[in-house]
Every structure is written in structure tokens, then in C-alpha cells.
UniProtKB/Swiss-Prot annotation:
Name of this chain's protein: DNA-(apurinic or apyrimidinic site) endonuclease 2
Impact after mutating residue 477 to E: Impaired binding to ssDNA. Impaired nucleolytic activity in the absence of pcna, but only reduced nucleolytic activity in presence of pcna
Effect of residue 473 to E: Impaired binding to ssDNA. Impaired nucleolytic activity in the absence of pcna, but only reduced nucleolytic activity in presence of pcna
Catalytic activity of the protein: Exonucleolytic cleavage in the 3'- to 5'-direction to yield nucleoside 5'-phosphates
Organism: Xenopus laevis (African clawed frog)
InterPro entries in UniProt: AP_endonuc_1, AP_endonuclease_F1_BS, Endo/exonu/phosph_ase_sf, Endo/exonuclease/phosphatase, Znf_GRF
Length: 517
């Protein structure tokens, strides 16, 4: 069994079709984050993919924001699925359950934590390596980012972490296994960050402190990585970071890079995408956990886990499945109608239509060649005219079929032909359209004058590190320098020890551009 997690940064922005993208990931369960699609914008190609059943969670606060989706192969159809961590928005039928003690959260807070579309749960039946059936719950999450300029988002992020832990541990205590995977938006160790700076400040981050107590010490893998040394802050939680379980000392293993600075070219990033599993599951069923930096299309790369267990498909998709949404279920029902014969319905419809329009109904043995359709404009005639034409038996008067349509003829005779004047002076027109040679000669000194007056921006300076032309940037952040422009090295961002990375050249441009508030 193979599981993949990927922050796709827009499900509708894939370079190829979604099915081709999913197939290329080669996994039984594919969890996507930051789909950036709300329910009203979800189209059928994204919702219903051949060979997969999908489960979405949409943002209810903003359009084109957040959102997660889990795609399961037909051979891995879950037995239950649920949107959100709190159960506020879930349908009790086919839900996962086990919410834990949420008394520390207010009802409004629970609704706020789930209304941004950041979690989808799917529960599967698996056959473990000992051929025993067990339950596996997969929690697909897109954890919030703590914006430094918005202190309330820092609190929101920590509360989301605590709700995630409450739900995951409650499901685990109820039996079975749990996998948490997705964009956690926190790099755990200095090894997971390209520039951890001061280690003391690094460890003081509240998100890292939560991960310390939530995750347990990884046991050295059987591949000989026994030299693993964990910091004293390592916790004794119920879950393992599966990647560090198998690759505890691997450096430069990043999953997210800044697209604006081109940091992916120099691998100057962070590892914030995880596949976390409960201890027993990782120790007994996991074979490996890897990152996939070769897969492009987002500012994140996928992460993948290989497991020994085999999935057991459910007979029917749970109610949360996207194909059951009315906007997509209705389309499938219409397609089914073309494949099912409905003789009685068609018969009644024919009788009703013949009574309403006054046209003769087709009976067995009738000469079809003698029946003619009435013109469409007769359907809009007044009730008085219909009463004269329709007989007591509901059949139309034969004279109505041969009656000349005076109205159409009158309209045709009243239309006057449109006279289009023909230009007979082609030579004169062509002569006027020809460019005037004296004018071109007259404009040459004007062009030289304007070029001398409007010289344009000066060429950019060369950076001191590489002697290459710099690029011009503009300060977007609010403050006294907002709108100011500056020159920096054109190379991608990277570590200071990397000669191929951007040097530290910086030069303000004297002229200040405008900045919107």
C-alpha cells in the first residue's frame, strides 16, 4: 500500500490533466492540500476522476483559499469519511467518529477551526502483514500558517494543532491505526531548515514545541543509521515522523521552497510536509518514507510512504464522496435515463403533448406520410384561434395544415432590400492609403529628438559577487520603505556558502515608486 501527500497549490492549476497527475504519483491514497477551490467552483473533471473516489473539504470563508482533498483508488475505497476535525460539519451517517474531549473549545471556536477547509478524514480496512484485518484512519490536513503581521493567526494555528492532537489520539485509543499527513507548516528540527539561525530561538517556536511533545523519539532504522542523536527536547508522543524514522540524519531533504526567489534551484527550503503514523504502525507496517523533489508543479514537492499492509475496498463509497454531490449526481442520473426504456412515460407525454398542441396523435396503422407538423408560430396563437381549430375529439382541423401563412408572407413583402453603395473610386482610395514618403523623412529628426529627451531607465548595475546585471525589486511590505525600489543579484536565493546562489549585493534606487495602502 502506498500513500502520497502533496500541497498542490491549486488543483485547477495542474499542467496536465488531474487523472494523469494522480496516476503519475502511483499511490493508493493521494492527499492534496491547498486545492484553492470552493464548492461553487468545483468542476466535474476535478471532482470525478476515473478510477478514484474523492473527498473534499472546502473553505467557507474565502474563495480560492485553503481546501484539502483525498483521492482513493477504487481498490482502496474507504468505509467512512468525514470533513473537519471537530464534527461540526459532518454527516453522522458514514462518519468516522471519536472526537475526544473538546470541552476546552467553545462551539464557535470549533466551527471557526473547521470552516477554512483544512481537514478530511477517511477510514479504511487493511490486511496487515500478519493477515489480520485492522482499521486505518488517514487524516489529511493543511495546517494554518502563522502570519507575523497577524498575531491572532498564531493563536489560531496552535489551537488547530491541539484539536488535531485531540482527535487523532481519540481515534487511536478507540482501536486501529492513525496516519496524519499533509502540510504541517512547521519545520521540526534544525536539520529540516535551510537556515535555522540561532538554535535557542529556533527551539522556542511554539509550533516546534508542540511537535516535540506530539512526536516520539524515532528508533534507528534497520539500515544502519544507529548514529542518530536526538536533542534533549525530543518528546515521547504517540506518533512518529516516518521520514526521520528511516532517514534520521539525511540533510537537505526539503519539501517547500520560495518560488519568488527561485530557491528551489539551489535547494534552499524547509521540510514542512510530513507523513506521521502511530508508533506501532510505523514499526510494523512501514517499509520506507521518501520525499519526491523531482515532481514539479507547485512550491511544494510530494512525500510518499510505502507500507506492507494491503487495502480492503469497501462495497460502497461513504456519503461524503464527491460523486454524491447533487450537482454531479444529477448529471449521472441524466446519463442513466438514456440507457433505460420508459415506455409508459413516453406514451403519456405523447398524449399530453397532442392534447395541448392540437396535433393528431400517432396511432398504429396510420399513414405517417399524410401527417405534417404545424408551423412553430402557430403554437403562440391565441386561445380563440385554438378553439376554432381543435375539434371535440382533440384532433386538429385539416384546413389548418393547408392554410397559407399570410403573416410570414406579409413580413417578407414588407422587407425592403438593402442597398449597399459600391465604391467606384478604388484607385483614389488606394492612393490615399499609400504612405507619404516626405512625412517619413520629416519624422526622422523628431524621433531622434524624443529619443534624446526620453532616454528610459539606465542599465542595471552589476552585482559585486558575480559581475552580472542585477534585477530591480520593489518593497511591498507596509512601512516607511513601501514603494521603494532596489537592485539585487539576479541569481536564485541560496545558502551563503553556495557560489551559485545570490550574493549579498544591494542598492537602493533613488526614485521612490507609489505604494498602495
Amino acid at each position: 500500500m502506498k500513500i502520497v501527500s502533496w500541497n498542490i497549490n491549486g488543483i485547477r492549476a495542474t499542467r496536465v490533466g488531474l487523472k494523469e497527475t494522480l496516476d503519475s504519483l502511483d499511490a493508493d491514497i493521494i492527499c492534496l492540500q491547498e486545492t484553492k477551490v470552493t464548492r461553487d467552483l468545483l468542476d466535474e473533471p476535478s471532482a470525478i476522476v476515473e478510477g478514484y473516489n474523492s473527498y473534499f473539504s472546502f473553505s467557507r470563508v474565502r474563495s480560492g483559499y485553503s481546501g484539502v482533498a483525498t483521492f482513493c483508488k477504487s481498490s482502496t475505497t474507504p468505509q467512512a469519511a468525514e470533513e473537519g476535525l471537530s464534527g461540526v460539519f459532518c454527516n453522522r451517517t458514514g462518519s468516522v467518529g471519536c472526537y475526544g474531549n473538546t470541552e476546552q473549545f467553545l462551539e464557535e471556536e470549533l466551527q471557526s477551526l473547521d470552516q477554512e477547509g483544512r481537514a478530511v478524514l477517511t477510514q479504511h480496512r487493511i490486511l496487515n502483514c500478519e493477515d489480520k484485518e485492522e482499521t486505518l484512519t488517514v487524516i489529511n490536513v493543511y495546517c494554518p500558517r502563522a502570519d507575523p503581521e497577524k498575531p491572532e493567526r498564531k493563536t489560531y494555528k496552535l489551537r488547530f494543532y491541539h484539536l488535531l492532537q485531540t482527535r487523532a489520539e481519540a481515534i487511536l485509543q478507540n482501536g486501529g491505526h492513525v496516519i496524519i499527513l499533509g502540510d504541517v507548516n512547521t519545520s521540526h528540527r534544525p536539520l529540516d531548515h535551510c537556515d535555522p539561525t540561532d538554535l535557542e530561538t529556533f527551539e522556542e517556536n511554539p509550533g516546534r514545541q508542540w511537535l516535540n511533545q506530539f512526536l516520539g523519539d524515532p528508533i534507528p532504522s534497520q539500515k544502519g543509521d544507529s548514529e542518530t542523536v536526538m536533542p534533549p527536547s525530543a518528546g515521547s508522543g504517540l506518533f512518529y515522523d516516518s521520514f526521520r524514522y528511516f532517514h534520521p540524519t539525511q540533510k537537505n531533504a526539503f519539501t517547500c521552497w520560495c518560488s519568488a526567489s527561485g530557491a528551489r534551484q539551489t535547494n534552499y527550503g524547509t521540510r514542512i510536509d510530513y507523513i506521521l503514523g502511530n508508533r506501532e504502525l510505523v514499526e510494523s507496517e512501514f517499509l520506507d518514507s521518501v520525499i519526491m523533489p523531482e515532481v514539479e508543479g507547485s512550491d511544494h514537492c510530494p512525500v510518499k510512504a510505502f507500507m506492507k499492509c494491503q487495502p480492503i475496498a469497501a462495497n460502497k463509497c461513504p456519503p461524503l464522496c464527491t460523486k454524491y454531490l447533487p450537482e454531479f449526481a444529477g448529471r449521472q442520473q441524466k446519463l442513466l435515463q438514456f440507457l433505460v426504456k420508459k415506455e409508459n412515460t413516453l406514451g403519456n407525454t405523447t398524449e399530453e403533448s397532442s392534447e395541448l398542441t392540437g396535433t393528431p396523435s400517432f396511432t398504429e396503422g396510420a399513414d405517417i406520410s399524410t401527417v405534417r407538423k404545424r408551423p412553430s408560430d402557430k403554437l403562440n396563437s391565441t386561445s380563440k384561434k385554438k378553439s376554432k381549430i381543435v375539434t371535440k375529439n382533440g384532433q386538429g382541423n385539416l384546413l389548418s395544415f393547408f392554410k397559407p401563412e399570410r403573416q410570414k408572407l406579409t413580413m417578407a413583402t414588407e422587407c425592403n432590400p438593402i442597398e449597399v453603395p459600391i465604391c467606384k473610386k478604388e484607385k483614389t482610395v488606394q492612393k490615399d492609403l499609400q504612405p507619404a514618403t516626405p512625412a517619413v523623412k520629416y519624422n526622422k529628426p523628431q524621433t531622434a529628438f524624443w529619443k534624446s529627451l526620453l532616454k528610459g531607465p539606465p542599465p542595471p548595475p552589476n552585482c559585486k559577487g558575480h559581475s552580472e546585471p542585477c534585477v530591480l525589486r520593489t518593497v511591498k511590505k507596509a512601512g516607511p520603505n513601501c514603494g521603494r525600489q532596489f537592485y539585487v543579484c539576479a541569481r536564485p536565493e541560496g545558502h551563503s556558502s553556495n557560489p551559485q546562489a545570490r550574493c549579498n549585493f544591494f542598492l537602493w534606487l533613488t526614485k521612490k515608486a507609489g505604494c498602495e495602502d
